[in-house]
From Swiss-Prot:
Subcellular location: Cytoplasm
The protein's name in its UniProt record: Protein-export protein SecB
GO molecular function: unfolded protein binding
Superkingdom to which the source organism belongs: Bacteria
Naturally occurring in which organism (per UniProt): Shewanella baltica (strain OS185)
Keyword Transport: yes
Subunit structure and binding partners: Homotetramer, a dimer of dimers. One homotetramer interacts with 1 SecA dimer.
Family designation: Belongs to the SecB family.
InterPro entries assigned to the protein according to its UniProt record, in alphabetical order: SecB (IPR003708), SecB-like_sf (IPR035958)
Length: 161
């Protein structure tokens, strides 16, 4: 019976404690002139994530989105959203925890951030903006691969010296 209780304590657990908007900004630096032009924007999306340990097994993950729309060479709008969440995560190995904080949690936060961006763009009276889904698992795998390559690069340079 003690073995069963011990195994239950070790079982991975993931709980969302809170999802909230940490920071938001919307700018239309060239209004009202931007509304007089034909609407043919170039939209750029920048993503960033970061995490911090708040307490034992409790983490804050912040997903930052910056959406910039250029129209005819002028900035039509700049929208920045930091969507955050507090997560309780237990029973994971270090690689599993890193994946949870770097991919799984941002996957949870993205729909909230996307909705906030869409709402702000609409309030700015611009045409509807629907951000495409993001594959955070692929982005995290790319990040891990880049870190591994950066870690092996100095060792290779020393061997060649």
């Amino acid at each position: 019976m003690a073995e069963v209780a011990n195994n239950e304590q070790q079982a991975p657990q993931f709980n969302i404690q809170r999802v909230y908007t940490k920071d938001v900004s919307f700018e239309t630096p060239n209004s009202p002139a931007v509304f007089q032009k034909e609407w043919n924007p170039e939209v750029k999306l920048d993503l960033d994530t970061r995490s911090a340990k708040l307490a034992d097994d409790v983490y804050e993950v912040v997903l930052s989105l910056t959406v910039t729309a250029q129209n005819g060479g002028d900035t039509a709008f700049l929208c920045e959203v930091q969507q955050a969440g507090i997560f309780s995560i237990t029973g994971l190995t270090e690689p599993q925890l890193a994946h949870s904080l770097g991919a799984y949690c941002p996957n949870i936060l993205f729909p909230y951030a996307r909705e906030t961006v869409g709402s702000l763009v609409g309030r700015g009276t611009f045409p509807q903006l629907n951000l495409a889904p993001v594959n955070f698992d692929a982005l995290f795998a790319q990040y891990v691969q880049q870190r591994q390559a950066a870690a092996t690069a100095p060792a290779a340079e020393e061997a060649n010296a």
